[in-house]
């Protein structure tokens, strides 16, 4: 297997989904690098969690520690400058007239994947892994399978490189995502994700629940909590 085919770049935010995807990639590729983005988001809690999660995941399995490669963080503040959303402004979370919550940052995943592909191109990496999902999600159009497939074609044509965008969570519920984490890394990985990853839109780390830290009221917390309860209840 060539180095291009043996290496993956994971979009790693510090949340539940991206941490599960990191474990998924470590289970399948010989070397895995991670990339995160500082885009002027409302809080930087997830970014702060990333180092602890990388350290923790490396301690779970020696082979994962050996495979875990470079970490990259890109600054793209322009995304926040052109986005009036609840993830980039201190405003209440609510539904918009278009049926999308105002947590939707237009083009965010498209921008992330494009920057990831540009970095992957420079580093000779063909495989890019993201935690997009259209099963338990808020209707974000840039999380849809058809969007990711179309972008894979565009990036491959635009850079003359046969990129493959992997979305292992695309058809999984949040309960099934918890189960996948258990299948990959046992209780140790589940506990690491529960205790150290961050999902809450409001950046709340003070409150501790059985499913992890968060306000417990925002859509992201509610989705994570519902998935946890279904997982522990055997409904994954």
From Swiss-Prot:
Looking up HAMAP family in the UniProt record yields: QueC
Natural source organism:
Bradyrhizobium sp. (strain ORS 278)
| Catalysis performed (reactions) | 7-carboxy-7-deazaguanine + NH4(+) + ATP = 7-cyano-7-deazaguanine + ADP + phosphate + H2O + H(+)
Q: List, separated by semicolons, the cofactors it needs.
A: Zn(2+)
What is the official name of this protein in its record?
7-cyano-7-deazaguanine synthase
The entry's function note states: Catalyzes the ATP-dependent conversion of 7-carboxy-7-deazaguanine (CDG) to 7-cyano-7-deazaguanine (preQ(0)).
Pfam families per record: QueC
What does the entry list as the binding residues for ATP?
A: 12-22
> Which gene holds the coding sequence for this protein?
queC
**One GO term of the biological process aspect:** queuosine biosynthetic process
Assigned protein family = Belongs to the QueC family.
Please name the CDD domains in this protein's record. QueC-like
Q: How is the cofactor bound?
A: Binds 1 zinc ion per subunit.
Stated EC number for the protein is: 6.3.4.20
An annotated Gene Ontology molecular function: ATP binding
């Amino acid at each position: 297997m060539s180095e291009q085919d043996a290496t993956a770049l994971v979009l790693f935010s510090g949340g539940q989904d991206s941490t599960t995807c990191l474990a998924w990639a470590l289970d399948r590729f010989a070397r895995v690098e991670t990339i995160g983005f500082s885009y002027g988001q409302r809080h930087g809690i997830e970014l702060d969690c990333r180092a602890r999660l990388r350290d923790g995941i490396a301690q779970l399995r020696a082979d994962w520690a050996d495979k875990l490669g470079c970490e990259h963080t890109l600054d793209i503040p322009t995304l926040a400058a052109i986005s009036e959303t609840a993830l980039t402004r201190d405003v209440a979370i609510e539904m918009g007239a278009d049926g999308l919550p105002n947590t939707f940052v237009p083009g965010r995943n498209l921008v992330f994947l494009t920057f990831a592909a540009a970095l992957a191109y420079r580093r000779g990496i063909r495989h890019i892994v993201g935690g997009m999902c259209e099963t338990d999600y808020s209707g974000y159009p840039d999380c849809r399978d058809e969007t990711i497939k179309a972008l894979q074609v565009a990036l491959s044509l635009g850079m003359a490189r046969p990129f493959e965008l992997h979305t292992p969570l695309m058809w999984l519920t949040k309960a099934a995502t918890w189960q996948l984490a258990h299948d990959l890394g046992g209780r140790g990985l589940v506990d690491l994700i529960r205790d150290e990853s961050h999902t809450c839109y409001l950046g709340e780390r003070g409150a501790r629940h059985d499913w992890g830290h968060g306000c417990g009221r925002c859509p992201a917390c509610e989705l994570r909590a519902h998935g946890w309860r279904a997982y522990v209840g055997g409904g994954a």
